[in-house]
C-alpha cells in the first residue's frame, strides 16, 4: 500500500491545477484528469499487489501451501484490464458531454477569477517587495554578528544569541504585520468572488438548462449502466474460475497439512 499511496501523492503533486490561476498553462480537461488518475491508481494497485503476492509465494509458508496465487493474480489483472477497455469509451462520452454542457459557466468563472486576479496582484506584489526588503535588512544585521562569532570564542555564543533574539522577533513582527495588512486588503475581493460565484450558481440553479442537464446526466448514467452490464458480467465470469481454483488449492493445502499432522 505504500507504493499506492506514494504513486497517488506524486500524481496529485505533479498534476495539481492550482497553478493555472496565476499562470497561463493550459489545464487538463476533467476527463483527462480523471482518466490519468484512474490509470495511475489502478496500475499502482496492480503492481504493488503483485509484489506482495510474489513475496508471499516465495516465503516458506507460501511454498508449503502452493496456492498458485501469482497465476490467479495475473488472470484477475487481465480480466480487470479488459473491463476497463470496454467501459472506457462510454465513460469518456459522459465526461465529454458534461464539459460541453458546462462550458458557459466555466467561461464566466474564469472571467471572474481573472478580474479578481488583476485587482489583487498589486497587493501581492507589494507584500512580496516588503517581505524581501525585511529579509535583506535582517541579513545585513545578522552578517556582522556571524563574522564576530567566527572570530570569537565559544563563550560568545550566549552573547550572540542575546543579540539575535531581538532581530528575529522584529522580523517575525514585521512579517505578521505584512500578512495582516495583506489579509485586510484581500478580504473585500474574497467576499466579492464568493458573491459572484453564489450569483452564478443561483442563476444556473434557476435556469431551465439545469433541469435539462440533470435529465441528460441521468440519461447518460443509465446508458452507462446498461453498457457496463456486459463488461461486468464478463468480469464475474472471469473471476469464477479464478476463485474456484483458489478455493480448491486452499482446501487441498489444508487436507495435505492435516494428513501430515495426523501421521506425525
Curated annotation (Swiss-Prot):
Residue spans of the sequence repeats: 67-88, 89-110, 111-121, 122-143, 144-165, 166-187, 188-207, 208-229, 230-240, 241-264
User: Could you give a single Gene Ontology term from the biological process aspect?
Assistant: cholesterol efflux
Family annotation (InterPro entries):
ApoA_E, Apolipoprotein_A1/A4/E
Localized where?
Secreted
Q: Which GO terms describe its cellular component?
A: chylomicron; extracellular vesicle; high-density lipoprotein particle; low-density lipoprotein particle; very-low-density lipoprotein particle
Q: Which residues form the signal peptide?
A: 1-18
**In the UniProt record, does the keyword Transit peptide occur?**
no
According to the UniProt entry, which residues carry Methionine sulfoxide? Answer: 109
Describe PTMs of this protein.
Answer: Glycosylated. Palmitoylated.
What's a single GO MF annotation on this record?
Answer: phosphatidylcholine-sterol O-acyltransferase activator activity
Ranges where the record places region 10 X approximate tandem repeats: 67-264
Q: Organism's domain of life?
A: Eukaryota
Pfam families reported in the protein's UniProt record? Apolipoprotein
Which keywords does the record carry? Cholesterol metabolism, Glycoprotein, HDL, Lipid metabolism, Lipid transport, Lipoprotein, Oxidation, Palmitate, Phosphoprotein, Repeat, Secreted, Signal, Steroid metabolism, Sterol metabolism, Transport
Query: Which residues pair up as cystines?
Result: none
Coiled-coil regions listed? none
Say which family it is in.
Belongs to the apolipoprotein A1/A4/E family.
Give the record's subunit note: Homodimer. Interacts with APOA1BP and CLU. Component of a sperm activating protein complex (SPAP), consisting of APOA1, an immunoglobulin heavy chain, an immunoglobulin light chain and albumin. Interacts with NDRG1. Interacts with SCGB3A2. Interacts with NAXE and YJEFN3.
State the protein's purpose.
Participates in the reverse transport of cholesterol from tissues to the liver for excretion by promoting cholesterol efflux from tissues and by acting as a cofactor for the lecithin cholesterol acyltransferase (LCAT). As part of the SPAP complex, activates spermatozoa motility.
Question: This protein is called what?
Answer: Apolipoprotein A-I
Amino acid at each position: 500500500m505504500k507504493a499506492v499511496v506514494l504513486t497517488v501523492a506524486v500524481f496529485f503533486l505533479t498534476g495539481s491545477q492550482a497553478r493555472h490561476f496565476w499562470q497561463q498553462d493550459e489545464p487538463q480537461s476533467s476527463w483527462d484528469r480523471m482518466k490519468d488518475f484512474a490509470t495511475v491508481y489502478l496500475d499502482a494497485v496492480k503492481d504493488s499487489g503483485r509484489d506482495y503476492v510474489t513475496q508471499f509465494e516465495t516465503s516458506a509458508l507460501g511454498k508449503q501451501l502452493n496456492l498458485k496465487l501469482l497465476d490467479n493474480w495475473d488472470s484477475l489483472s487481465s480480466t480487470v484490464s479488459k473491463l476497463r477497455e470496454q467501459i472506457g469509451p462510454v465513460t469518456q462520452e459522459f465526461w465529454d458531454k458534461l464539459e460541453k454542457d458546462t462550458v458557459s459557466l466555466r467561461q464566466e468563472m474564469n472571467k471572474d477569477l481573472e478580474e479578481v486576479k488583476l485587482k489583487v496582484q498589486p497587493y501581492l506584489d507589494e507584500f512580496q517587495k516588503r517581505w524581501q526588503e525585511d529579509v535583506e535588512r535582517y541579513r545585513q544585521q545578522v552578517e556582522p554578528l556571524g563574522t564576530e562569532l567566527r572570530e570569537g570564542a565559544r563563550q560568545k555564543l550566549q552573547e550572540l544569541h542575546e543579540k539575535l533574539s531581538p532581530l528575529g522577533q522584529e522580523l517575525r513582527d514585521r512579517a505578521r504585520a505584512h500578512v495582516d495588512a495583506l489579509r485586510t486588503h484581500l478580504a473585500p475581493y474574497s467576499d466579492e468572488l464568493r458573491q459572484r460565484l453564489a450569483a452564478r450558481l443561483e442563476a444556473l440553479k434557476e435556469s431551465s438548462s439545469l433541469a435539462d442537464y440533470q435529465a441528460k446526466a441521468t440519461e447518460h448514467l443509465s446508458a452507462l449502466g446498461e453498457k457496463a452490464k456486459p463488461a461486468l458480467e464478463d468480469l464475474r465470469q472471469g473471476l469464477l474460475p479464478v476463485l474456484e481454483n483458489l478455493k480448491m488449492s486452499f482446501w487441498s493445502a489444508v487436507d495435505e497439512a492435516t494428513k501430515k499432522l495426523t501421521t506425525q
